[in-house]
């Protein structure tokens, strides 16, 4: 874990989490919930990582902007993030789109989602604003980024990842000088600029920005008055500052939080079914790339009161077992076998069923003799007895949402259409 060597800037900052996006590439997983509300890691939701990073970084004022199908996200935060105390100068504001500046205008972009709540932000008087995306998996101490922002005198400091240059085509990319001052910002370039001294890599935006609050509000008001703006940080606010002010890149390797078991700086955009499945399955490794057991940097969440997991039956062909798997509380593995799988709370896996490479969301019931391989099963699904998934690619593609790599997303509506 990184060690602080400077006065805490987090106490003078407010974190503002942008959590209104659908995440359409997750397909049916976001039919009923926003991407930040999607379950991750057996216990948490995706948004818990950005919120936990802020809390662990010493930030005690947090706002969360919501929009698309926000009920489950809001309910989760009301239950799990309701411990902030105003008498300690703490606050946690949930800010759903509510036409606050116009009777016809919802949040029209990421910048607009902050602009419409300026009157809520200003009374708190934060000196700095830390703008965060609420849909990524990573551990980061924002104090280091705040301190760089203060020391550099930048108008904006942007969190960046070093990625192979040809993988940067899907990101906003920073063209920097040898002191990491940003001299150009290009959104999803066909030919990303390389890093000085390391031309095979590019600096990709993490969607994390630090501003002085007064300067940010000036930028948002100017942008709101521009009829040609799309009201977006990446498309409008940041390019304007790069051109007319001082923008500095902050490299994730300088502030990522790693335990003794984590070798690399871990950041994932779990925005596709394949990426979501892989990031969850990664947690079943003996030494996972992401250490969610690090008590010095806990991932806070809402946890239901539930009994422990239970494994029953010990016959030769009917043994409740789990190998290289993560199993949450209130699961009953009744004569089923799990391998390289991750189960959320309340799953029931019945006799003779076999799960391999399965990511199983809460309250799923797996019928007897089901054979499930390389699947993501949505919340509350009932798997019929004897169902086989992962053996016949053509049949799977007809029944489920099957990716090119062979991962099948299964929802209850898909099950209901089966003619078994």
Curated annotation (Swiss-Prot):
GO terms for molecular function: ATP binding; glucose-1-phosphate adenylyltransferase activity. Gene3D superfamilies: Hexapeptide repeat proteins, Spore Coat Polysaccharide Biosynthesis Protein SpsA, Chain A. It catalyses: alpha-D-glucose 1-phosphate + ATP + H(+) = ADP-alpha-D-glucose + diphosphate. The gene is glgC. Disulfide bonds: none annotated. The keyword ATP-binding applies. It comes from the Bacteria. Its EC number is 2.7.7.27. This is Glucose-1-phosphate adenylyltransferase. Alpha-D-glucose 1-phosphate binds at residues 107, 172, 187-188, 205. GO terms for biological process: glycogen biosynthetic process. Belongs to the bacterial/plant glucose-1-phosphate adenylyltransferase family. Involved in the biosynthesis of ADP-glucose, a building block required for the elongation reactions to produce glycogen. Catalyzes the reaction between ATP and alpha-D-glucose 1-phosphate (G1P) to produce pyrophosphate and ADP-Glc.
